[in-house]
């Protein structure tokens, strides 16, 4: 009797199925961003900055390394003349 009880206790717990636990992906950014930012910028514009903070933060660092002047001034955040527009590279 005790042997059967031990076998029941030693069974591994059921694993979480993949559909219930999907990893975070940029796809979650696209639906809210389609209304406020161009999809070519990765779907992480200023309108969706709250729901897409990680991707926006990562893109911002990458853009600052490439074009520090235009991004730090913020000249391209509204109009986008020097490479930081809504659809240029994720610095909007």
UniProtKB/Swiss-Prot annotation:
<dbReference type="Pfam" id="PF14672">
    <property type="entry name" value="LCE"/>
</dbReference>
<feature type="compositionally biased region" description="Gly residues">
    <location>
        <begin position="76"/>
        <end position="92"/>
    </location>
</feature>
<keyword id="KW-0417">Keratinization</keyword>
<feature type="region of interest" description="Disordered">
    <location>
        <begin position="1"/>
        <end position="46"/>
    </location>
</feature>
<dbReference type="GO" id="GO:0031424">
    <property type="term" value="P:keratinization"/>
</dbReference>
<feature type="compositionally biased region" description="Low complexity">
    <location>
        <begin position="26"/>
        <end position="46"/>
    </location>
</feature>
<feature type="region of interest" description="Disordered">
    <location>
        <begin position="63"/>
        <end position="92"/>
    </location>
</feature>
<comment type="similarity">
    <text>Belongs to the LCE family.</text>
</comment>
<feature type="compositionally biased region" description="Pro residues">
    <location>
        <begin position="11"/>
        <end position="25"/>
    </location>
</feature>
<comment type="function">
    <text>Precursors of the cornified envelope of the stratum corneum.</text>
</comment>
<comment type="subunit">
    <text>Interacts with CYSRT1.</text>
</comment>
<dbReference type="GO" id="GO:0005829">
    <property type="term" value="C:cytosol"/>
</dbReference>
<feature type="compositionally biased region" description="Low complexity">
    <location>
        <begin position="1"/>
        <end position="10"/>
    </location>
</feature>
<protein>
    <recommendedName>
        <fullName>Late cornified envelope protein 3D</fullName>
    </recommendedName>
</protein>
<dbReference type="InterPro" id="IPR028205">
    <property type="entry name" value="LCE"/>
</dbReference>
